[in-house]
C-alpha cells in the first residue's frame, strides 16, 4: 500500500491542506459530477467522505462519469470506494447504497450535491439548512455547460436567491438530446472547479484560525480566497463567469 504521506506530498504545504484533512465531506449523487468530485477531493484525504447513491454502473455511464468497464454492474458507491482505495490510497469512506431522501439525515462539515434532479437538490438544501454544515456546493451540468452554486450559512442573501430563483420543478429544467447530455471533459472540469471551491473554503478556515490566534494580516503568508455564489462555464465560448 502506498503510504498516506507520499500520496499528498506534492501539496501538503498548501494553506488549505491541514484544514481540508479535518473535514467530513458528504457527496450525494455519483454521476458525472459526484464521481469526479470524489476523485479530486479523495486525493486530499479529508477526515471522512460520506457517499450516497443507489444506482448501478451501466455502460452508458462510462461516456461521462468516472467509471471503467470493470465497474459495470457494480454499485456506484462500491466502485467509487474501490477507486479511492486504489488511486488515492484513501480509506475513510462511508459508502451508502441508497438515495438521500426523507427520512435520511446526514451531518457533514461540507455537503456536495451531484444530483441530476431538482427534487433531490431541494432535499439536500433543506437538510443542509437544518444541519451544522457551513458549506453547500450544488453542481449542475449539461454536455458543454456547467453551473456551480456555493452557499455559506452567513450568506443569507445568497441563500434566499438560491431558494427562490434556482430551485424549481423538474419539468421546468431543460432536457437535452439523449446522445448529447454529458461529456467526460466537462465532468472532469466541474469536478475540478468544485474542488477549487472546497480548497478556497478550507483556506479561509485556516486564515480565520490564525487571525483568532492573534496573528496580524502581515504575519499570515496567504490571503483569504473568494467563494463565488455562482460559477458558470460555457465550452462553446470558453468563458467563465462568477457572481457573488
Task: Describe each model-derived feature in a short phrase.
Residues 90-95:
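Hydrophobic/aromatic anchor residues within beta-strands of the central parallel beta-sheet
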Residues 2, 22, 106-110, 114-244:
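Glycine-rich phosphate/adenylate-binding loop
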Residues 1-25:
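N-terminal charged helix/coil linker that caps or initiates catalytic domains
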Residues 62, 100, 141:
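Hydrophobic pocket-lining residues within nucleotide cofactor-binding pockets
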Residues 48-88:
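Glycine-rich phosphate-binding loop and adjoining beta1-alpha1-beta2 segment
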Residues 96-102:
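Conserved SAM/SAH-binding loop
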Residues 21-45, 50-56:
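Glycine-rich adenosine-cofactor-binding loop
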Amino acid at each position: 500500500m502506498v503510504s498516506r504521506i507520499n500520496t499528498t506530498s506534492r501539496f501538503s504545504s498548501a494553506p488549505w491542506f491541514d484544514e481540508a484533512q479535518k473535514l467530513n465531506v458528504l457527496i450525494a449523487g455519483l454521476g458525472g459530477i459526484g464521481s469526479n468530485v470524489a476523485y479530486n477531493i479523495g486525493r486530499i484525504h479529508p477526515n471522512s467522505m460520506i457517499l450516497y447513491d443507489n444506482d448501478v454502473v451501466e455502460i452508458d455511464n462510462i461516456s461521462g462519469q468516472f467509471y471503467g468497464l470493470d465497474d459495470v454492474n457494480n454499485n456506484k458507491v462500491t466502485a467509487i470506494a474501490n477507486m479511492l482505495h486504489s488511486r488515492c490510497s484513501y480509506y475513510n469512506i462511508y459508502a451508502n447504497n441508497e438515495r438521500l431522501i426523507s427520512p435520511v439525515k446526514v451531518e457533514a462539515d461540507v455537503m456536495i450535491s451531484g444530483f441530476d434532479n431538482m427534487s433531490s437538490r431541494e432535499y439536500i438544501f433543506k437538510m443542509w439548512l437544518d444541519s451544522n454544515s457551513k458549506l453547500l456546493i450544488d453542481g449542475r451540468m449539461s454536455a458543454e455547460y456547467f453551473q456551480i452554486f456555493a452557499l455559506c450559512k452567513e450568506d443569507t442573501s445568497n441563500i434566499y436567491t438560491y431558494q427562490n430563483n434556482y430551485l424549481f420543478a423538474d419539468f421546468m429544467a431543460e432536457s437535452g438530446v439523449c446522445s448529447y447530455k454529458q461529456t467526460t471533459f466537462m465532468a472532469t472540469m466541474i469536478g475540478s472547479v468544485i474542488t477549487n471551491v472546497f480548497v478556497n473554503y478550507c483556506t479561509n478556515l485556516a486564515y480565520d484560525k490564525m487571525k483568532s490566534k492573534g496573528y496580524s494580516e502581515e504575519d499570515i503568508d496567504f490571503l483569504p480566497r473568494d467563494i463565488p455564489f455562482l460559477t458558470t462555464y460555457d465550452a462553446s465560448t470558453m468563458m467563465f463567469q462568477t457572481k457573488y
